[in-house]
Regions:
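A generic secondary-structure signal marking the coil-to-beta-strand transition
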Residues: 56-58, 120, 141
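Soluble non-cytosolic domains of exported or imported proteins
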Residues: 36-43, 124-131, 152
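Conserved acidic residues
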Residues: 1, 17, 143
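Glycan-binding loop/region signatures in secreted carbohydrate-active enzymes
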Residues: 3, 64-135, 165-170
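Substrate-binding surface in catalytic domains of secreted glycosidases
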Residues: 4-94
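Acidic/aromatic/glycine-rich contiguous surface patches that form carbohydrate-binding/processing clefts
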Residues: 130-170
Length: 170
C-alpha cells in the first residue's frame, strides 16, 4: 500500500533539508468518497517513510480542505466539490446535517440532500482530526506538521497548534 517505486524516501531525505510528506488525498476529487487523510493510512505512510529514513527532517502534511461528493458515486463520472473545512461546517449548519466523527479514520463527515434531493457526503478536517495528526507527528519524532492549502483556513487549527506546539516559521 505505501511502498512505492515512485519515491525514493531515503534519497530524498538525504538530499533535502526538510521533506513535506503528503499523507492526504486518499479521498480525492475523482475518487470514491472517503476521508481525505484517514489516520490508519497516514500512519502507514509514516511507518514506511521512517523505515527508510529518520524523522527529524520530515514534516507531516495535513489538509485544511473538504470534499463534497454527490451520491451515488460513479467511477469516472462523479466529481467532488472542493472547499475549506470551515465552509464544510457552515454547509452542515445550512442544510441541517449532523456532523459525525469516524473513529477509525479519525475524520469528520456528514450526509445531506441538496435541493434536487440528491444525496451528498462531505469529508473534511477539524480540530479533532488535526489533533490526532499532530499527536502522531509527535509520537513519531517528526520535525513538525505542515498544512496544505493554508488559504482555505480552518480557524480551529491555529489555537490548537498554539496550545500543543511551539510554532516556528520557516
Amino acid at each position: 500500500m505505501c511502498s512505492s517505486d515512485l519515491h525514493d524516501y531515503a534519497l530524498l531525505s538525504k538530499a533535502a533539508n526538510a521533506v513535506f510528506l503528503m499523507t492526504y488525498e486518499w479521498g480525492y476529487v475523482y475518487g470514491e468518497p472517503q476521508a481525505i487523510a484517514p489516520l490508519p493510512q497516514v500512519r502507514a505512510v509514516l511507518d514506511y517513510a521512517l523505515s527508510v529514513t529518520a524523522g527529524e527532517n520530515i514534516f507531516l502534511g495535513a489538509p485544511l480542505y473538504a470534499y463534497d461528493w454527490p451520491l451515488p458515486y460513479e467511477k469516472g463520472r462523479t466529481r467532488a466539490e472542493t472547499f475549506s473545512s470551515q465552509a464544510a461546517v457552515a454547509r452542515a449548519r445550512l442544510v441541517g446535517a449532523e456532523i459525525e466523527f469516524d473513529e477509525t479514520a479519525r475524520s469528520p463527515c456528514y450526509h445531506y440532500f441538496d435541493k434536487m434531493r440528491r444525496e451528498h457526503v462531505v469529508w473534511f478536517e477539524d480540530a479533532r482530526s488535526l489533533r490526532a495528526k499532530i499527536a502522531l507527528a509527535a509520537e513519531k519524532g517528526l520535525q513538525g506538521i505542515g498544512f496544505w492549502q493554508a488559504g482555505r483556513e480552518l480557524a480551529q487549527a491555529w489555537p490548537l497548534l498554539d496550545a500543543l506546539l511551539t510554532l516556528e516559521t520557516l
